[in-house]
């Protein structure tokens, strides 16, 4: 069977819970790794230079800072974020259509000023740590979790951005409404038998790809492994 995609290009490794030295040691052990995710923890620890350092090592960067503020602030933040060269940048869909539009317009401007292609902006719908019961009880939102995800994905699409972040459990329905090239990127990925940690809405890698995920965010299954290369290659093999 000939694959229509490269398995390694479907996986984004979350670089959480590590120092800069540990990040670079891990990267050296993963020659087939293409995508890395820089989240709030690593960005706060090391600043924007970590993105340049990862790109210098040939990695594509998913900058997952989940910007959520008034439109002007979101625009200014995404303008600066785009100048780092990150290929993917997240905003919260709950920031609203105006905020997302301003973020997208400013990101395009920032990238252009430094001679880079514009990043893809992705809207976070509902965090995968939320379960349906907690979602209603704690936030008081009288919508089902699925309904809320659909509403926010539609908002993101109407704002003109390139995709959204959702759990793998919502992907199949969203993919029917939003065909490629709209990106559906999914955390909450665990191979069979792996600890689910703080995720609630999960699937295996192959299940998520079959459901319509564009890319999968993986983390502790690789970063906590005694042999990260074997763990990464094992996940890749599950997609073949």
From Swiss-Prot:
It is an enzyme of class 4 (lyase). Keywords: Decarboxylase, Lyase, Pyrimidine biosynthesis. The active site is at residue 66. GO terms for biological process: 'de novo' pyrimidine nucleobase biosynthetic process; 'de novo' UMP biosynthetic process. It catalyses: orotidine 5'-phosphate + H(+) = UMP + CO2. It comes from the Bacteria. Its EC number is 4.1.1.23. GO terms for cellular component: cytosol. Signal peptide: none annotated. Pathway: Pyrimidine metabolism; UMP biosynthesis via de novo pathway; UMP from orotate: step 2/2. Pfam families: OMPdecase. InterPro entries: Aldolase_TIM (IPR013785), OMPdecase (IPR014732), OMPdecase_AS (IPR018089), OMPdecase_bac (IPR047596), OMPdeCOase_dom (IPR001754), RibuloseP-bd_barrel (IPR011060). One of its GO terms (molecular function) is orotidine-5'-phosphate decarboxylase activity. The keyword Lyase applies. Substrate binds at residues 16, 37, 64-73, 128, 190, 199, 219-220. Gene3D superfamilies: Aldolase class I. PANTHER family: OROTIDINE 5'-PHOSPHATE DECARBOXYLASE. Homodimer. Belongs to the OMP decarboxylase family. Type 1 subfamily. Catalyzes the decarboxylation of orotidine 5'-monophosphate (OMP) to uridine 5'-monophosphate (UMP). This is Orotidine 5'-phosphate decarboxylase.
């Amino acid at each position: 069977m000939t694959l229509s995609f490269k398995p390694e290009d479907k996986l984004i490794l979350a670089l959480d819970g590590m120092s800069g030295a540990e990040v670079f040691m891990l990267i050296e052990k993963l020659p087939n790794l293409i995508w890395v995710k820089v989240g709030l923890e690593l960005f706060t620890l090391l600043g924007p230079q970590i993105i340049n350092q990862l790109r210098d090592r040939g990695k594509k960067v998913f900058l997952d800072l989940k910007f959520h503020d008034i439109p002007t602030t979101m625009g200014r933040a995404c303008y600066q974020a785009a100048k780092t060269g990150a290929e993917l940048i997240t905003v919260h869909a709950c920031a609203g259509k105006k905020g997302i539009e301003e973020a997208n317009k400013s990101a395009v401007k920032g990238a252009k000023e430094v001679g880079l292609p514009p990043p893809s902006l992705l809207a976070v719908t509902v965090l995968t740590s939320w379960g349906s019961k907690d979602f209603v009880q704690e936030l008081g939102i009288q919508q089902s979790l699925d309904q809320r995800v659909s509403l926010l994905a539609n908002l993101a699409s109407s704002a003109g951005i390139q995709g959204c972040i959702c759990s793998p459990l919502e992907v199949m329905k969203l993919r029917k409404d939003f065909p490629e090239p709209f990106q559906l990127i999914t955390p909450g990925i665990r191979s069979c038998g792996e600890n689910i940690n703080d995720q609630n809405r999960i699937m295996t890698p192959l299940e998520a790809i079959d459901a319509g995920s564009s890319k999968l965010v993986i983390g502790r299954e690789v970063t906590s492994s005694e042999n990260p290369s074997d763990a990464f290659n094992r996940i890749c093999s599950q997609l073949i």
